[in-house]
Regions:
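Rossmann-fold dinucleotide-binding core
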Residues: 144, 148-212
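Conserved NAD(P)H cofactor-binding loop of Rossmann-fold oxidoreductase domains
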Residues: 88-91
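Redox-cofactor binding/interface segments in oxidoreductases and associated redox assembly factors
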Residues: 79, 85-86, 147
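N-terminal Rossmann-like dinucleotide-binding module
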Residues: 5-31, 35-38
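Long, compositionally biased stretches enriched for glycine and/or charged residues
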Residues: 189-435
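Rossmann-fold NAD(P)-binding glycine/threonine-rich loop
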Residues: 94-161
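Glycine-rich phosphate-binding loop and adjoining beta1-alpha1-beta2 segment
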Residues: 25-63
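Short acidic low-complexity segments
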Residues: 67-80
Length: 435
């Protein structure tokens, strides 16, 4: 009997039931025989709850034959896997909350994928993700790592540069934008094609096609007239119409952190005072979710998961697995090596771009050069990415300092030096490479 094993690193995540739902709905195309859920000892209770819920969900759909295994080490989970999904959080949500509070202490944004928050999370995550990659090299060399771990672009590039494991990075921002823009146009999803190019959480829609008609300017006009592209976890501040028309492209929700910085910072400061930082809010949501997940009568993904902020996560993951496993040659937006697709970026730079997905992995579609306003910002952030990776891999304080200085949301030496000292102190248990 042919086997199809999927290992989920961070299997105790609150997002996992959405992934399980996606696998169940696509079981005809993706005949999974084993789901190996991996977590750390601190997540033992959560992963046990997730495993039990997974078994109930499978039983509801007549898939009791799918084996669900739980692991607190990597070897047995990865051995024999065709796909290794990474959705881990080193330091758990408490570390994210500390990152956010640290940023606000310096009157800076500390969001978990941008600024000092993204920096600290990358330092904690890269050594661990490289351990996973080395296990994949040794125990499942033909497997694909599908990475959801934030900051997804940096983490994916670290694995791509420092291991031989096959990796593709994923994010739910492009698919959310696809759904929202199709909705704005009152069109079916399959009728609308978006051309993306940029970096993870710094990607633009450069062209919108509805059938054979280009409707980019129409969508921009709709955004200028009150429509909005927003996500649960990002304040939906409106873009000035003059700016959008000058840009001639559609920014992703995360661009607000870079181009509407004062307003976004003010909102986060106020939120931290009243309802808590985003991580502190998520902790409350997660506690409620796991209370629901633990109910023995629950055998489907609960509606409350939509409040967590990971909408369409499973859709992206399952579509990617399907495209690789069945050699579909399907176009998707992923994080992969540039290989000349975006001019001016190194071939080994990981970019977020439309790609053809088949059994060989991801092949980015040629794009060309980004317009100057986008290229300048993106090159600066890519420099930050590279320096952060070097700092995380080698425990290099010099690279870490330069990374923070190069980040547009820090951008000055005085704050960077002070922030670095605090990041290294607060995160000492996870940053042994700097000791």
């Amino acid at each position: 009997m042919q086997t199809l094993k999927i290992a989920v690193i961070g299997g105790g995540s609150s997002y996992t039931p959405e992934l399980i739902e996606g696998i169940i709905l696509r079981h005809q195309q993706i005949p999974v025989t084993e789901l190996a859920l991996v977590d750390v000892e601190a997540g033992r209770e959560k992963v046990a709850i997730i495993a039990a819920l997974t078994q109930r969900m499978l039983k509801r759909h007549g898939l009791e034959q799918v084996k669900v295994s739980v692991h607190f080490g990597l070897d047995e989970a990865i051995r024999g896997a065709q796909f290794v999904l990474t959705q881990l959080r080193v330091g758990q949500l408490a570390a994210r909350a500390a990152d956010e509070r640290l940023g606000l202490k310096y009157h800076l944004l500390g969001q978990e994928t941008t600024g000092v928050g993204g920096f600290a999370k990358a330092l904690r995550t890269i050594p661990v993700i490289l351990q996973v990659a080395r296990k994949v090299e040794a125990l499942a060399p033909d497997a694909f790592i599908l990475n959801f771990t934030n900051p997804a672009g940096i983490v994916t590039e670290a694995v791509s540069r420092y291991s031989s494991a096959k990796i593709i990075g994923l994010c739910n921002v492009p698919i959310n934008m696809q759904h929202m823009i199709a909705g704005m146009l009152d069109a079916k999803e399959e009728e609308v094609r978006l051309s993306f190019a940029g970096l993870n959480h710094m990607v633009w829609v450069h062209k919108v096609m509805q059938g054979r008609e280009e409707v980019t300017s129409k969508v921009i006009d709709m955004l200028c007239n009150g429509q909005s592209l927003s996500m649960n976890n990002i304040q939906s501040l409106p873009w000035p119409a003059e700016f959008l028309r000058a840009l001639k492209a559609i920014p992703c929700p995360y661009h607000r952190y870079f181009w509407l910085t004062p307003a976004m910072l003010a909102e986060e400061i106020e939120a931290a005072k009243t309802k808590g930082t985003r991580a502190e809010q998520v902790m409350k949501v997660e506690q409620e979710l796991f209370d629901i997940y633990a109910r023995p009568e629950l055998d489907e993904k609960p509606e409350q998961l939509s409040f967590r902020g990971g909408a369409y996560y499973s859709e992206v993951a399952v579509e990617l697995i399907n495209a690789i496993y069945n050699n579909l040659g399907k176009e998707m937006v992923v994080n992969t090596r540039n290989n000349g697709a975006i001019h001016g970026f190194d071939d080994d730079a990981v970019v977020e771009i439309n790609s053809i997905i088949d059994a060989q992995g991801a092949r980015p579609l040629a794009f060309g050069a980004l317009p100057p306003i986008m290229n300048g910002l993106t090159q600066q952030v890519k420099a930050f990415d590279r320096l952060t990776i070097e700092a995380a891999v080698h425990g290099c304080r010099d690279s870490a300092l330069l990374a923070l200085v190069s980040n547009p949301l820090v951008g000055n030496v005085t704050d960077a030096r002070a922030l670095l000292d605090e990041v290294l102190t607060i995160n000492r248990p996870w940053l042994t490479q700097f000791n």
